[in-house]
Amino acid sequence: MDKKKFYSGICFGLLLIFLQGPVYSQSVKIDGEIRTRAEYRNGFQSPLADTLHNATIGSLRTRLNVTYSDDKIKAKITLQDSRTYGQTGINSTNNSLGLYEAWGAYMFTPELSATLGRQSLEYDDKRLFSAANWSNTGNSHDLLLLKYETKTGAKAHLGSAWNNGGDVLYESAYNVSKSYKMMTYIWLAKSLGKFDATALWVNDGFQRGATNDLINKLSYRNTVGGNLGFKDKTIPYSFYATAYYQFGHNPKDKSLRGYLLALKNQYSVTNKW
């Protein structure tokens, strides 16, 4: 089946479902994005050897978003095509159309909700979780996310993911590059007057190998820390402090131990900047 027709059919079918029922309590939004850019690369990611030459490339990202919302249910589908100019011929049958986001959320109460599906995540200064919008593909996660958010500024998020490389019948090697086998995280946030405090714990597990004796053995990496921000509209100074500690094991089961301390200070010369 043509992948483009398949995804288009999904969007059209869901749109028909969303439009059923009382219109006054529902909202459907359809929008898109066409983003192109050119890059001149001379030592990008790593120093360029003397025997190699610089490169100039152009890239294109196209997205189609369908968002539905009512008092109890929210949903979003984002189709994405990411390509480099000249990567495929105009008659090529290969395509790069994919599913960037596809999730549904149910509001149990105004404060408590559950979201299931592929979704982009962004927290704090985007150091650990980011949609990576600069990337031509972006980042998203397949997971279940529980949210509890109060009107007083207190927030708690619990996310959990378990990945497989296909529709497997038994535990198999997970060979998706740069991706975890499982992940659980907890994010807490609270506004305290002019201060905003957050805490984050992330536990992700990676298969130690592809053989039968290793696929059931996971190496777990833990990252725990938090952020403290200060901002007062009556003064021109603000800061954002970050602290993280990482421990556990990497995918090759090597021991991990690392620290991060960061402080960002900002002083506004005028209110217009």
Protein language model regions, located:
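Cleavable N-terminal export/targeting peptides
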Residues: 1-27
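Beta-barrel outer-membrane channel/assembly domains of diderm bacteria
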Residues: 10, 23-121, 143-151, 156, ...
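Sequence/structural signature of outer-membrane beta-barrel proteins
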Residues: 37-45, 82-88, 119-132, 161-172, ...
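Short acidic (Asp/Glu) patches
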Residues: 98-99, 128-130, 140
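Membrane-interface loop-to-helix entry segments
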Residues: 139-148, 177-185
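Internal metal/ion-chelating core segments
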Residues: 154-241
